Amino acid sequence: MTRLQLALDEPDLEVAVTRGRELIDLVEIIEVGTPLVIEYGMESVRRIREACPGVEVLADLKVMDVGRLEAALAFRAGADWVSVLGVAADATVRGVLEAASDAGGRVLVDLIGCPDIPMRAAELLRLGANMLCVHTAFDCQEAGVGPLDELSQLLEVTPAERAAVAGGIRPETLPAVAELAPEVVVVGGYLACHSQPREAAAEMRELLTGEQVR
């Protein structure tokens, strides 16, 4: 069954902690978003880990260099997952994977900006990446760009259980994404901006899994 990941991208740690606690029973993974990591460092990972027991925590570091060291910091802070960019060098990806192996953690590779997703995905799978994520950049979403085509490309070479998708996913786009059955669907901005985030998260979960949670 596809899992739902909550991306906490607001750069206010107290707001993020509150949102994580509010939605913890509706998601399987909580992401400590890049803005939080930039603003608060590893303290953001520690706080979300402490506030949200029972779910997996992903530190969205988007590692581009110094892979082993940077990933180790997040794993020591309590992350279950760390993200590395797919455009990073293989040596960097290997470093993140080594840190994950040392810590018993896992690695998500963010394919944002990758010019050839099937080719790079195949390379990353050979390196041992646990999860590959197609990701429509926030700055491109206003132009109507979405991740569906890239998800289809990813699934040409990647087992669904190692595929994730992120970027502007909303109730009206979720059914088409869910039909492709990736392992993880990441939702951030839609829930962050919603006046009733718990109701919105429940709706997304129902659309994704078919289970009634309201």
Where are the language model's segments positioned?
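Hydrophobic faces of well-ordered beta-strands that scaffold small-molecule active sites
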Residues: 2-8, 30-32, 57-61, 82-84, ...
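Structural signal for hydrophobic packing residues in well-ordered secondary-structure cores
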Residues: 24-27, 52, 100, 158, ...
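Conserved anion-binding
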Residues: 4, 66-160
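Conserved N-terminal beta1-alpha1 strand-loop-helix module at the mouth
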Residues: 1-68, 76, 117, 122-127, ...
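A C-terminal functional module that forms or caps the active site or interfaces directly
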Residues: 145, 151-179, 185, 190-191
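Short C-terminal domain-edge/linker segments immediately following a structured domain
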Residues: 35-39, 61-63, 88-90, 114-115, ...
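C-terminal helical cap(s) of enzyme catalytic domains, especially alpha/beta-barrels
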Residues: 96, 151, 178, 189-214
